[in-house]
Regions:
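Membrane-embedded transmembrane alpha-helical bundles that form the catalytic cores
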Residues: 1-448, 456-492
Length: 493
């Protein structure tokens, strides 16, 4: 089920909130918890119930292994160490095997066939929604159990930790000690109207980012990549690149706002996952702002176990690049994602290597270079193949044709704005007289929003009449734009 859908907004969310708080009010906290788990199952299996057995099996196996890791065994210390390492290895093999089969099997076999001229059959496996997210979340719990850093939670608590629907399909990747204590806090079992208002505002803001901005830009991006082989001009390629840069920004930012807002409605504060990444002054800074919980997971469970920065300069750079290769592979089974991760690893390593020179540059130059790097690397993230990405970059660098065709410019129109100014003669005349003004105004406005406003999660929330009006306006605007419902980009990872 999608946050940006009528059934979620008008059916699922009211039912879930009403049943959860209603059961708590009746003094049935266990039933409230179980109901929230079952509603999360409905949310997950809405489009394809076949996904449910995968997630349920994963939850059961990981919970049992974690229980065994937490158990006080009556053995010698050496025997316990061997047993726990064996259990952890089984758990990691199970989880990585699950991801490999559903996400990477066809990719692996396809490349095997190409390299060795074999003819192994592809299975055309449908990727279960959010498998990378709920698997990584459970891996973190299992590793923490191995380290003795977890409490003994019952199965319902564990299932709720994994399935809580605001973060189930596209993150953030939460830790057990971030959410489970909040569910156990009795003060969170009754409606907090300040949190409800805060959550509704965040949800409404995220809905506009997704349904109005990101989905509009998705049409422009699809047009640009679709016309790459049909004499796409250099200026059209540049505008397409910028359109995707802002599409993925507002798509992911919108999702994070909506997920955070939904958490607030249940009195649960989920960790920040997005913090104005296009304000970054370096690639290192970018990854302190983009997908924060994935960065935290890779740092804690991949980078540090590899040795981090403790084994010399060369090993540090190798570890950094390895982590970003894992990040790229995590995002998708395609060489484009791996190469995207590799480029970010190189960028991160070079920034560290030339730290003094970088910091001696003016901040404006630091921002410009970082933003340009992020833009160019997003091309690999979006392209269907590395060859297509290089063809796209070649088209940008050609500067042979700076014309922009009218059908492409029309894709940048926000329908609501067009409807307004078309009924105001003066504005309509101005807009009609300046070719491409829709694209110019939209992209300039998005630059302004990204660079001059705080992230919604950073702002101190104060419920006021003005904010209530803004919330209602955003909610209505977003809902009326839901005629063409589309998935969030990160649902595919």
């Amino acid at each position: 089920m999608l946050f940006n859908s009528y059934i979620f907004i008008f059916v699922f969310l009211p039912l879930t909130l009403g049943s959860y708080y209603g059961l708590h009010k009746l003094g049935k906290p266990v039933f409230a918890k179980i109901t929230l788990i079952l509603m999360s199952f409905w949310f997950y299996g809405y489009f394809n119930p076949n996904y449910l057995w995968i997630m349920c099996s994963s939850i059961i196996v990981n919970y049992l292994l974690s229980q065994l890791l937490q158990r006080k065994w009556e053995m010698s210390a050496a025997q316990i160490a061997v047993l726990k390492k064996s259990l952890l290895a089984i758990g990691l093999i199970f989880n990585l095997g699950l991801i490999f089969y559903f996400k990477y099997y066809d990719f692996f076999v396809d490349n095997l066939n190409k390299v060795f001229s074999t003819d192994f059959q592809l299975k055309n496996i449908v990727l279960p929604l959010g498998i990378s997210f709920f698997t990584f979340q459970q891996v973190s719990y299992m590793v923490d159990s191995y380290r003795g850093e977890t409490k003994e939670y019952n199965f319902a608590d564990y299932a709720l930790f994994v399935t809580f629907f605001p973060q189930l399909i596209a993150g953030p990747i939460v830790l057990h000690n971030e959410v489970l204590p909040q569910f156990e806090d009795k003060n969170n079992w009754k409606i907090n109207w300040d949190n409800m208002a805060h959550g509704l505002y965040m949800f409404a803001a995220g809905l506009v980012k997704k349904a109005v901005i990101a989905d509009t830009l998705s049409v422009s991006v699809a047009w640009g990549y679709g016309h790459l082989s049909q004499n796409l001009t250099s200026m059209e390629a540049i505008l397409t690149m910028l359109a995707y840069t802002f599409q993925i920004y507002f798509d992911f930012s919108g999702y994070c706002d909506m997920a955070t807002g939904l958490g607030y409605m249940f009195n649960i504060q989920i960790p920040m996952n997005f913090n104005s990444p296009y304000k970054a002054l370096s690639i290192i800074d970018f990854w302190k702002r983009w997908h924060l919980t994935l960065t935290r997971f890779l740092r804690t469970y991949v980078y540090f176990p590899l040795g981090g920065s403790r084994r010399g300069t060369v090993r540090t750079y190798i570890n950094i690049i390895t982590v970003f290769l894992v990040s790229g592979l995590w995002h998708g089974a395609n060489w484009t994602f791996i190469f995207w991760g590799f480029l970010h690893g190189i960028g991160n390593a070079l920034t560290r290597m030339f730290k003094k020179q970088w910091e001696s540059m003016h901040e404006v130059m630091q921002w410009a270079v970082t933003f340009l790097f992020v833009n160019v690397t997003w091309i690999f993230f979006r392209a269907d193949s590395i060859s297509q990405a290089f063809a796209f970059i070649k088209r940008i660098l050609g500067f042979k044709n700076l014309n922009v065709r009218a059908p492409f410019l029309q894709t940048f129109q926000l329908k609501e704005f067009h409807l307004i100014y078309s009924h105001i003669p003066v504005l309509n005349k101005i807009m009609a007289s300046i070719r491409g003004v829709d694209a110019l105004v939209l992209l300039a406005g998005l630059f302004f929003l990204c660079l001059n406003f705080k992230n919604n999660q950073e702002m101190k929330f104060r419920p006021t009449a003005k904010l209530a009006v803004l919330t209602v306006f955003c909610l209505v605007w977003g809902i009326f734009t839901l005629s063409g419902v589309s998935e969030f980009l990160y649902f595919n990872f």
